[in-house]
């Protein structure tokens, strides 16, 4: 078998069906669009969600909630991911981005107590959960809110 001898499996490839190319093709005259009407015209058709004038579903259902314009979204870091750093390291948001722990700092870094911390670290972040703060201090490290 050589590269120039490769062929697709029979039946796996289909030629495009060109419509409006004469009556003998079976797809001439109306080109599969039926007779007249909105859907037969060029650019015809209704927008997605249109229900023929009936009040559409998205308008029948009630509105819920609101979007807080001042919402802060924190990049989350778990304690077990901090184990990759050597003891005595000062863990900063810049270091976390540099090492690929978080892709971006978003509105800040929040440390959560998922997993167990075995190394003594100085952790600088914008927020800490109570349990994370206790776990870092129990491991002999220090917590700094920036």
Curated annotation (Swiss-Prot):
Q: Locate the compositionally biased regions of type Basic and acidic residues.
A: 1-18
What are the coiled-coil residue ranges?
A: none
Q: Name one GO biological process term.
A: translation
Q: Where is this region: Disordered?
A: 1-69
GO CC terms: cytosolic large ribosomal subunit
Which keywords appear in this protein's UniProt record, sorted alphabetically? Answer: Ribonucleoprotein, Ribosomal protein, RNA-binding, rRNA-binding
One Pfam entry name = Ribosomal_L27A
Q: Where is the composition biased (Gly residues)?
A: 42-52
Molecular function terms from GO = rRNA binding; structural constituent of ribosome
Among Gene3D superfamilies, the record links this protein to: 3.100.10.10
Among PROSITE patterns, the record links this protein to: RIBOSOMAL_L15
Q: What does this protein do?
A: Binds to the 23S rRNA.
Regarding protein family, the annotation reads: Belongs to the universal ribosomal protein uL15 family.
Q: How does it assemble?
A: Part of the 50S ribosomal subunit.
What protein name is recorded for this chain?
A: Large ribosomal subunit protein uL15
Species of origin reads Exiguobacterium sp. (strain ATCC BAA-1283 / AT1b)
